[in-house]
Amino acid sequence: MAISSRNTLLAALAFIAFQAQAVNVTVAYQTSAEPAKVAQADNTFAKESGATVDWRKFDSGASIVRALASGDVQIGNLGSSPLAVAASQQVPIEVFLLASKLGNSEALVVKKTISKPEDLIGKRIAVPFISTTHYSLLAALKHWGIKPGQVEIVNLQPPAIIAAWQRGDIDGAYVWAPAVNALEKDGKVLTDSEQVGQWGAPTLDVWVVRKDFAEKHPEVVKAFAKSAIDAQQPYIANPDVWLKQPENISKLARLSGVPEGDVPGLVKGNTYLTPQQQTAELTGPVNKAIIDTAQFLKEQGKVPAVANDYSQYVTSRFVQ
């Protein structure tokens, strides 16, 4: 009886110790429809890391940057534009994983009466400020020879963009899913981020982590990267087969807020990376993308200063 009681006590103490060591992590995600959402839906990250995970949906990268800066969020999903702003403001974060290289999943959708870029002059175009689509909009206007001041650019979050479009308050918006799908129902795509990237202004979707959290819990960050990369590989290996599996489509539709019929087109709209490609991008190109984006945003008056190097905000150690 004494041995049994002692074992019970030891088990209880071990459980208490485990509870004390358990890691709580808040992850900020956005509504892009991409294969790694399957891992989110299946709670793979929590299972592999042993952490208690709180997934929180945000409408834009700018709000995620604020949450990261305050410490409310430890891991977050950002586009390259809010990333460049965060790095320029010295927010203590680092990129540890690429979610995707953005393509036609982000687009400038306008009223059907707008047939050419010049028709944008004097029109009211909405975009979430300091987002990848804000950067892409400014880059597109520059490519077309249109000054930002010639267009009324308004700062709206995606849900507000949908409402403003339905009321007729705006003539167009550069945005992502599910808002881009809502606007396309009775609008037209004037350009998208794949084309803008070909014009010299590519955009990325990345995962970042607070540096203090990464230093304290490297195994948790590594588990996150592994869960996301593993979820993407079946799609990379055979996109058509992956997209024909109903459970994949339903999971992405639920987390992205788009109709299931729209999911395949959105998934195909971006480029996803193998582990080897992740390492290659994180050891040079991502730093260059931050520099290029920050320099462009400085030209547009969106950031006050630009550094010559942002490599301290990028790491490949969690994907190797």
UniProtKB/Swiss-Prot annotation:
SMART domains: PBPb. CDD domains: PBP2_taurine (cd13560). The keyword Cell cycle does not apply. Its main location: periplasm. It is found in: Periplasm. InterPro entries: ABC_Gly_betaine_transp_sub-bd, Peri-bd_TauA, Solute-binding_3/MltF_N. GO terms for biological process: cellular response to sulfate starvation; cellular response to sulfur starvation; taurine transmembrane transport. Keywords: Periplasm, Signal, Transport. One of its GO terms (molecular function) is transmembrane transporter activity. Induction: Repressed by sulfate or cysteine. Residues 1-22 form the signal peptide. One of its GO terms (cellular component) is ATP-binding cassette (ABC) transporter complex, substrate-binding subunit-containing. Belongs to the bacterial solute-binding protein SsuA/TauA family. Part of a binding-protein-dependent transport system for taurine. This is Taurine-binding periplasmic protein. It comes from Escherichia coli (strain K12). The gene is tauA.
